[in-house]
UniProtKB/Swiss-Prot annotation:
GO molecular function: alanine-tRNA ligase activity; aminoacyl-tRNA deacylase activity; ATP binding; tRNA binding; zinc ion binding
Name of the protein: Alanine--tRNA ligase
GO cellular component terms listed in the entry, alphabetical order: cytosol
SMART domains found in the cross-reference section: tRNA_SAD (SM00863)
Translocase keyword on record: no
Annotated gene: alaS
Protein species of origin: Shigella dysenteriae serotype 1 (strain Sd197)
Family matches, as InterPro entries: aa-tRNA-synth_II/BPL/LPL (IPR045864), Ala-tRNA-lgiase_IIc (IPR002318), Ala-tRNA-ligase_IIc_anticod-bd (IPR018162), Ala-tRNA-synth_IIc_core (IPR018165), Ala-tRNA-synth_IIc_N (IPR018164), Ala-tRNA_ligase (IPR050058), Ala_tRNA_ligase_euk/bac (IPR023033), DHHA1_dom (IPR003156)
Lineage: Bacteria, Pseudomonadati, Pseudomonadota, Gammaproteobacteria, Enterobacterales
Family of this protein: Belongs to the class-II aminoacyl-tRNA synthetase family.
Keywords: Acetylation, Aminoacyl-tRNA synthetase, ATP-binding, Cytoplasm, Ligase, Metal-binding, Nucleotide-binding, Protein biosynthesis, RNA-binding, tRNA-binding, Zinc
Entry EC no(s): 6.1.1.7
Modified residues (N6-acetyllysine): 74
Amino acid sequence: MSKSTAEIRQAFLDFFHSKGHQVVASSSLVPHNDPTLLFTNAGMNQFKDVFLGLDKRNYSRATTSQRCVRAGGKHNDLENVGYTARHHTFFEMLGNFSFGDYFKHDAIQFAWELLTSEKWFALPKERLWVTVYESDDEAYEIWEKEVGIPRERIIRIGDNKGAPYASDNFWQMGDTGPCGPCTEIFYDHGDHIWGGPPGSPEEDGDRYIEIWNIVFMQFNRQADGTMEPLPKPSVDTGMGLERIAAVLQHVNSNYDIDLFRTLIQAVAKVTGATDLSNKSLRVIADHIRSCAFLIADGVMPSNENRGYVLRRIIRRAVRHGNMLGAKETFFYKLVGPLIDVMGSAGEDLKRQQAQVEQVLKTEEEQFARTLERGLALLDEELAKLSGDTLDGETAFRLYDTYGFPVDLTADVCRERNIKVDEAGFEAAMEEQRRRAREASGFGADYNAMIRVDSASEFKGYDHLELNGKVTALFVDGKAVDAINAGQDAVVVLDQTPFYAESGGQVGDKGELKGANFSFVVEDTQKYGQAIGHIGKLAAGSLKVGDAVQADVDEARRARIRLNHSATHLMHAALRQVLGTHVSQKGSLVNDKVLRFDFSHNEAMKPEEIRAVEDLVNAQIRRNLPIETNIMDLEAAKAKGAMALFGEKYDERVRVLSMGDFSTELCGGTHASRTGDIGLFRIISESGTAAGVRRIEAVTGEGAIATVHADSDRLSEVAHLLKGDSNNLADKVRSVLERTRQLEKELQQLKEQAAAQESANLSSKAIDVNGVKLLVSELSGVEPKMLRTMVDDLKNQLGSTIIVLATVAEGKVSLIAGVSKDVTDRVKAGELIGMVAQQVGGKGGGRPDMAQAGGTDAAALPAALASVKGWVSAKLQ
């Protein structure tokens, strides 16, 4: 009996654990502190800094089953998902890694043992082929002489991409940095399937499938292209779980493995589909995996960056559900079956099931409102199409008006053998972005990552000033030996009391000084293992090796500590008041305010906000001790410590406890006791995305300042109303009631004036071929009264065509009314469009009533004068 996907995942991890590898949990799909990546898309992403020498772990061998998403940017599989056997938006990458430990020999032997041993995967050896880089004789000989693979099944692959080292079998992290040859293992499904071995003209067939890629990082590529050997070569491997499951379960398509069969059946059940071979079932089964895990990792549907990619995937799934005949929201119902089929790998998702389901349901409901209208418009455009390409402007209009991502439009078009002008779409998108940038006043801001080889020791938990030594200086991202007065720079010290921005807490400010210099620190950031002090040399000169006195701005740090500790109290209070589904989705802690984003599906009620505020202040009055302990990560989680969104933790972690009320993993700086916070006040609660709320709050002196400000405002209002704070509410209610009464009386007067004006106007109507035509510009009439006047005039005049206009604050308002018996010849929408075009505007409406606006008031008389001729031509 073949292994299940869950059993294959566990067997892989167990095998490498038996070979001395640390089993490391999958990292978040949102890469930590890596702006170069949209999503985690490979097992090595979480170890990137280790390979670059910027980070160290307490193990030199690791193994993972890493959740990955490829659905945006360079690595984008979205358009092929559902139409091929092996494309997915979400997949799991099994991997084993060596950080300067074993190299080619052991990496190859491990792979061969796992794949062929009867104890493990027991694949027939004669079905396995391998490729090596053309000049990698060492790997070739290991495969041939030690493993025993015949030469005819070992294929050398050269530089097949048009440049030196540009090869399927040479891996590079970037233009510079670690790189090296790789060896790939292929499985031969047999001659009943079309395709040829790798490197042959038929290599794109499905007979020979790559199942494992083993990368040997042995060189450091320099800027001039030269390759220098690394002092400690490393290994990075990747094997797609779904691919190896297909091989071990004797199927040719990933969608036929047990995991997908179960999900496809669940999709069929919730959509009512009966044909299990329908490609839409495969699309939805794939998409629920990426969408659910992305939301669980903190991504929310939006119109930008990661959130937009998520929205695209959700909407593509919803559209395929629509094709299957789904009559109601269905997508969120697949989260439960997904959790069941993922087994132990779905535990994180299970904890957030309710939140994930709610976000998916809300997004589907929102899109459902525009889906049918958008599809109808697309059908109309395709019906009019004379060629085989839909223009980019139409694709953009579908996106801008109906929320259709361009790949969804492309999906519909592909089903009809029509292409989409994606270049035209991108041009329209870029024009919209340009307008948005100009409107916002913001341009691009790029901050290149500084490469620092040295490390800094942080001593800021216990010290706010200490002596250190300059180990590196950077100006404009480049290392320098010295800086002079007036220069902006980054200063790295061997030890520092300055806290570098992390975990939502901003970096410290302060001063680095000596007898002959002063460096003003405006920010502090991490650069790998180093801490960079960012600022300007105010006086003197500074060079590498100089001794400095590092002084943190103590008052600012104190305010930050209070806000950070209050954030922990508020997090715990939110979970008590709203429920345990609340989890942190982001935070900002500075010296003025704390901002906290958290998962919750609706706006907080006033009484809930008050309850959270009261609960936090109760803990402040308890004056609980705030204690820290260093322990193993797993032990901390077992103790109930909450790990925060987006953070990357070492195996040894800092656990922060506030009595029995709050326990979290945190590396930030905090008060000594909760009583130090003094007072906590929530100043705003709002939504930032579907399923995400944001609270802003203040503490200590900042909270007291808001109390004083509120009191001052109340006193001012009481003075204006000639009352006091005791009867202020009654006074306000009285004023509001009087205001409502006056507004009602004013509206009645306006309606009476409009009725009188209508009566006066009716006598000015002229006869045009048996129809009364009335065209008039009115002064002193509110635009919203025009519609009432047109209705009155239509009742008075019978068969009639009316155009009224008014100008307010330089803007033209137009309305056209046509009696029902005339709409077969004159349509109000066409008439108003003709007039509006002449005054720099546009508009539309029903055949009997239409409205428009314009910006060119000077052109209004001529535009109104043109109505008679236009109407006469229509009535002939």
